[in-house]
Amino acid sequence: PDMKGVLLAAVLAGGMISAGAQEKLSTNRKTMKTHTSTIRLIYPQWQGGNVAAMVPEVKDPDDVARGYYLGAQLLDFLAPCGGQETLTVPVSTQIGERRVTDGVLDRDVILRQTKAALEMLRASDPGRIVTLGGDCSVSVVPFTYLAAKYGGDVAMVWIDAHPDITLPGDPYPGYHAMAVTACMGHGDAKIVAELPAACD
């Protein structure tokens, strides 16, 4: 059931530019400093999910959690490319001891991967992003990057089986369940401090 949310988040992240921004781009292309290129962002982050908490009968929950990683690879294979630049966020596949830090499972790994994704986007400077991922939290970086790029002239539509509005310290520590609150500038202080903008 969570994969449907991931697929939809990938589609929605690709259409993140608002009507107002599209009009500005089409009528004022020569004077705008923004690029209108579309990139594919392969973001196979799996650490935001805690499969063991969601499906306790799974025999090897850590191995199953990496299914998010495989899902990103499958989406990359199945979704038509269209010739745009493809960036792949480096995501660790190592499973060590999974830790909750300040209320977020695997927070330090997620923070490193967030920084890497942002660095890639800043270097590429895309106007649109098609995100193919991993868990729901892979939408946080693209949404907040585009919110900063278009000065808040971005609307976020989040359709998922779960609202993804939990906070650090809530009973479930998976970051994928905190994706919307992170996009809105709330949540783990270290992660939120790295995000370029908030979606109001």
Language model segments and positions:
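Bacterial N-terminal signal peptides that target proteins for export
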Residues: 1-7
